[in-house]
C-alpha cells in the first residue's frame, strides 16, 4: 500500500532538483501605455476643473444659478465627448497599425 504523500517530493528532493529555467526574454512592457494614462489624467482634471470653473464664471457674469448649472453640464458633456473622440482616434490608429502588420506578414 502506498503512502499518503507518495506523489509529493520531500524537501530534500525539491532542494536538490535543478531550478526551473528562466525564459530568455520576458515582456516587461506596462499593461497600459503611459500616454494613455496621461490623457486620462488630463481629461480627469478637465472634468473636475472645467464644469466647476464654468459654473462660477457664469454666476460671476450675473447669470442665474440655473443658467450656470446648464453651462456646467454642457461643459462636462463637451469634455466627455472629446475624451471619447480622442480614444476612438487612438483605437483607430492602433487598428490601422495592426492591419499593416498583418498585411506585411501575409506577403
Swiss-Prot record:
Pfam families: VMA21
Protein localization: Endoplasmic reticulum membrane; Endoplasmic reticulum-Golgi intermediate compartment membrane; Cytoplasmic vesicle, COPII-coated vesicle membrane
Sequence segments annotated as region (Disordered): 1-29
Lumenal side: 62-68
Cytoplasmic side stretches: 1-40, 90-107
Main location: endoplasmic reticulum
Topological category with respect to the lipid bilayer: Multi-pass membrane protein
One of the protein's GO biological processes: vacuolar proton-transporting V-type ATPase complex assembly
Transmembrane segments: 41-61, 69-89
HAMAP family according to UniProt: VMA21 (MF_03058)
UniProt xrefs under PANTHER family: VACUOLAR ATPASE ASSEMBLY INTEGRAL MEMBRANE PROTEIN VMA21
Function: Required for the assembly of the V0 complex of the vacuolar ATPase (V-ATPase) in the endoplasmic reticulum.
Name of the protein: Vacuolar ATPase assembly integral membrane protein vma21
Species this chain originates from: Aspergillus clavatus (strain ATCC 1007 / CBS 513.65 / DSM 816 / NCTC 3887 / NRRL 1 / QM 1276 / 107)
